[in-house]
């Protein structure tokens, strides 16, 4: 039981979130701009049940496995000048290859050193390009999740074509690694309005394509629960490092600040810290050293659960009373991921 910050009546988490969400949806229409959901700003409960073992903060790393799945010309990289269309971008493709040759081995060794398991979102073509690396990621105990057939948008596809785009990556990953993905991440998180139904049809447990919360939540889809394990843009290295003056030390401090604030909040609310790593970006020597220091710092604190995203999703489902349940309307009305039917 928790206390709503706007009245003294004791309500469950689901009742509070549901009431505010229903009000937001009721006020929306297809003719109006997308509206953010109204929700509570404070939730209290018994912190012993937030995470396994009474942990007060969950920390989850993603490793984006994309090299080999990018277009041969026009993929984003570190060179500001765009190459002429159709001309192979040799240095940018080599930049992607760095992740496979150097970045992934270095990051996997770092995770082994600290006993941390992560979720690797894999592009099907990248797995075909470097199957041994994909298998090694899984062999070391990390999650193989799906990231599409190639490194490109899929939201503009028809429902059936988007489904095939996802299925192709799932089947490739399962065939090569022996692990069938239950988690999904789209290119820059953009999906069609039918994505939750499609993922549910394909047996997925969760997706990460929404940066709206600092904790997992459930969206009912056709009467069944589907989990969102939210994304964080500002903890994504591909977003952080292009800023002028940003370096490994600044990134380490940003990680610590994020951790410290969420760790403090974790005494009273379920909190989760998500960090997204790209092998070609965070896999460089100095950046791995900064991550090493951050992991040592985070592991020095009591009550921190380092978890794969499939573990977080399953725990959220198994502890539904502590997990926000958001009954959303159609994405065409709310502008947010939800059931399209």
Residue spans of the language-model regions?
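Catalytic alpha-helical scaffold of carbohydrate-active enzymes acting on polysaccharides/glycoconjugates
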Residues: 39-183, 188-227, 252-271, 275, ...
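N-terminal secretory signal peptides
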Residues: 1-11, 19-24
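Short, local alpha-helical segments
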Residues: 238-242, 274-281
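A conserved mid-domain beta-alpha-beta active-site/ligand-binding segment of alpha/beta enzyme cores
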Residues: 232-259
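Boundary at the C-terminal end of the N-terminal hydrophobic targeting segment
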Residues: 30-38
């Amino acid at each position: 039981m928790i206390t709503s910050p706007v009245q003294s009546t004791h309500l469950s988490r689901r009742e509070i979130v549901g009431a505010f969400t229903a009000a937001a949806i009721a006020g929306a229409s297809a003719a109006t701009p997308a509206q953010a959901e109204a929700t509570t700003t404070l939730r209290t409960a018994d912190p012993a049940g937030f995470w396994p073992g009474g942990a007060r903060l969950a920390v989850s790393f993603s490793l984006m496995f994309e090299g080999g799945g990018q277009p041969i010309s026009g993929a984003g990289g570190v060179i500001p000048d765009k190459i002429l269309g159709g001309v192979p971008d040799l240095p940018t493709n080599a930049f992607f290859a760095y992740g496979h040759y150097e970045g992934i081995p270095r990051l996997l060794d770092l995770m082994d050193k600290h006993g941390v398991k992560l979720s690797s979102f894999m592009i099907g073509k990248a797995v075909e390009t470097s199957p041994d690396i994909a298998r090694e990621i899984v062999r070391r105990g990390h999650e193989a999740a799906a990231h599409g057939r190639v490194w490109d948008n899929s939201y503009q596809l028809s429902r059936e074509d988007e489904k095939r785009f996802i299925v192709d990556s799932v089947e490739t990953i399962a065939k090569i690694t022996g692990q069938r993905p239950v988690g999904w991440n789209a290119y820059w998180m953009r999906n069609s309005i039918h994505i939750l139904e499609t993922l549910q049809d394909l047996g997925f447990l969760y997706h990460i394509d929404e940066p709206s919360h600092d904790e997992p939540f459930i969206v009912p889809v056709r009467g069944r629960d589907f989990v969102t394990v939210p994304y964080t843009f500002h903890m994504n290295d591909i977003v952080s490092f292009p800023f002028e003056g940003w370096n490994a030390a600044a990134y380490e401090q940003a990680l610590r600040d994020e951790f410290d604030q969420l760790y403090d909040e974790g005494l009273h609310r379920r909190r989760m810290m998500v960090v997204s790593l790209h092998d070609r970006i965070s896999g460089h020597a100095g950046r791995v050293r900064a991550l090493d220091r951050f992991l040592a710092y985070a592991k020095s604190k009591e009550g921190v659960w380092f978890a794969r995203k499939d573990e977080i999703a399953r725990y959220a489902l198994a502890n539904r009373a502590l997990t926000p349940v958001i009954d959303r309307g159609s994405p065409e009305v709310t502008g947010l991921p939800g059931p399209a039917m």
